[in-house]
């Protein structure tokens, strides 16, 4: 028999129940799509664009949607950007980003398919962009932009909670050469990626002054889908990290917990993301105006060639 260490036995004990949950998740996923997400009717007027990823979170869909909507608007298009209302923090950030931009409107919805058809019938928008509608198989006729960080998932152990994937390649006709010509797969890592997400500035939340690199270590307070990638991007920017405080994506406890952290570390410096900054209420902002809080802004870099061949 092969030798097993205590750690390997522990990992196996943890893996088996997770695999069982992944199998149950897979069954529910297939049933939900068969009963509730049957392919619907295509739009008649607007161009439908879906931005998605296999990852459960942290793939960069929202930053990419910001770039995409600006790109489409710069070409003279009117754009509707649809986001799930559950992601309240992302919606706040998106509305801040596009405040004053008459070419782009942000909509919060529980049903992208229904709202897309309502907007299509209004004939007010040239393009309708869905932030994370990859799993909604009702959205027929869409151009899908898939942000890919790993190889396409093909096995059950890659699904949540064993892995970080929501579905398999075969669920979207992406395996074994069945890829639709209406799917654009953009790699986000590795050599010469099609898309890069880069932190280009870190500014004081209140004064707007730039963060001075090579100063004291900072604490990261983060409620993103992939907080470790956020930390890695900050290190690439030149920031030395002290403590890390991570919260679930879209956590409604973020503000209260962040305030406790500041109270316990009043003289220390903190860096948060734009999305986390957008969710902070006015009371928090007024109360902590003397705190050393910096906001990291991220830019999406896409080559001219890739941008020209998206559609």
Can you annotate each of these PLM segments?
Residues 2, 7, 11-49:
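Extreme N-terminal, non-catalytic leader segments
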Residues 76-78, 124-125, 141, 215, ...:
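Short, high-confidence coil segments that cap the C-terminus of an alpha-helix
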Residues 269-275:
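Acidic beta-strand-to-loop metal/phosphate-binding motif
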Residues 248-252, 289-311:
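Short, flexible loop segments at boundaries between secondary-structure elements
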Residues 90-98, 232-237, 259-262, 280-290:
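Short, aromatic/basic amphipathic alpha-helical patches
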Residues 2, 7, 153-269:
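C-terminal accessory "lid"/substrate-recognition subdomains
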Residues 33-87:
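Walker A (P-loop) phosphate-binding motif
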Residues 86-194, 203:
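Phosphate/Mg2+-binding loops and adjacent switch elements
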